């Protein structure tokens, strides 16, 4: 690497880290204070939803993705809001009824969860959608089943993700179809990612999955699409363009960006 490349890398890293990380409090000793309550024993909690009974937080424990680090496995966890303790959910494998029949999973296959979403389906069941990066790029579907002191996960199917997409987050509809945010190319380098974080060019867009097909949502292009949240009743989806430094309100009927913040 040349001296100029090194200088550029350091400058880009400093700029991006200042924008996205900011000041951090040392919580390595897992001690709370009068401003911050620290709950220990969780590993890389990435995305969080509250369970239907409002008694637990369910979360994905992120493994890792490129270009920041090597892809590796993670898992899932529940936080009991009353006892402040961690619970590892039980997972069982059943018939694939909510995914692509060509996609399969075995009991011993590891998980690499990223973005998640939980919705009450039209049939009354609770469906959890998971963006999964390990060992393969898939969308995993689970039914959440209430138990006495926890929630269990029943695998109900998956969808293989084509190489052209690299997903971050998912928003489910009540009929089992969904939207997902495509971040950027899978083979993006760290230098390229840092450069985009400075110049804010478009890298990805929103994808809709229905009729067992992925389809781009026109007009949703932006820099680093990240977290998304769907209001199905109004056909509005909120998109966090991470590298673009904005949260955008997007109309799914007109395929137009209505408003943005930051």
Residue locations for each model-derived region?
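Beta-rich, blade/repeat-based domains predominating
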Residues: 42-52, 95-120, 155, 160-178, ...
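A short helix->beta-strand "capping" segment at the edge of beta-propeller domains
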Residues: 19-44, 98-102, 152-153
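Blade/loop signatures of beta-propeller domains
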Residues: 8-34, 149, 191, 199
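Short, conserved, GDST-rich strand-edge loop motifs in beta-rich repeat architectures
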Residues: 59-74, 130-131, 180-201
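Beta-strand-rich domains and repeat architectures in extracellular enzymes and scaffolds
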Residues: 37-75
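Blade-loop segments of beta-propeller domains
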Residues: 63-66, 71-122
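Conserved beta-propeller blade signature
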Residues: 56-58, 127-129, 177-179, 236-239
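Short loop/turn segments that connect beta-strands within beta-propeller blades
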Residues: 80-84, 144-148, 209-213, 251-256
């Amino acid at each position: 690497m040349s001296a100029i490349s090194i200088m550029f890398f350091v400058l880009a890293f400093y700029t991006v880290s200042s924008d996205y990380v900011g000041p951090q409090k040392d919580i390595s000793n897992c001690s709370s204070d009068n401003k911050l309550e620290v709950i220990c024993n969780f590993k890389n909690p990435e995305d969080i939803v509250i369970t239907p009974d409002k008694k637990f937080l369910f979360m994905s424990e992120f493994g890792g993705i490129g270009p920041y680090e090597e892809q590796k496995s993670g898992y899932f966890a529940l936080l009991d809001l009353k006892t402040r303790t961690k619970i590892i959910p039980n997972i069982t494998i059943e018939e694939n009824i909510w995914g692509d029949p060509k996609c399969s999973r075995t009991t011993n296959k590891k998980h690499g969860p990223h973005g998640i979403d939980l919705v009450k389906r039209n049939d009354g069941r609770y469906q959890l959608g998971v963006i999964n990066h390990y060992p393969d790029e898939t969308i995993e579907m689970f039914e959440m089943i209430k138990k006495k002191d926890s929630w269990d996960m029943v695998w109900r199917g998956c969808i293989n993700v084509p190489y052209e997409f690299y997903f971050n987050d998912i928003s489910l509809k009540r009929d089992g179809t969904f939207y997902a945010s495509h971040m950027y190319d899978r083979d993006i380098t760290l230098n390229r990612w840092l450069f985009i974080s400075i110049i804010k060019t478009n890298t990805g867009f929103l994808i809709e999955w229905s009729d067992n097909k992925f389809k781009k949502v026109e007009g949703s292009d932006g820099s680093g699409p990240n977290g998304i949240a769907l209001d199905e009743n109004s056909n509005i989806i909120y998109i966090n363009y991470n590298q673009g430094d904005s949260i955008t309100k997007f109309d799914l009927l007109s395929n137009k960006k209505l408003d943005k913040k930051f």
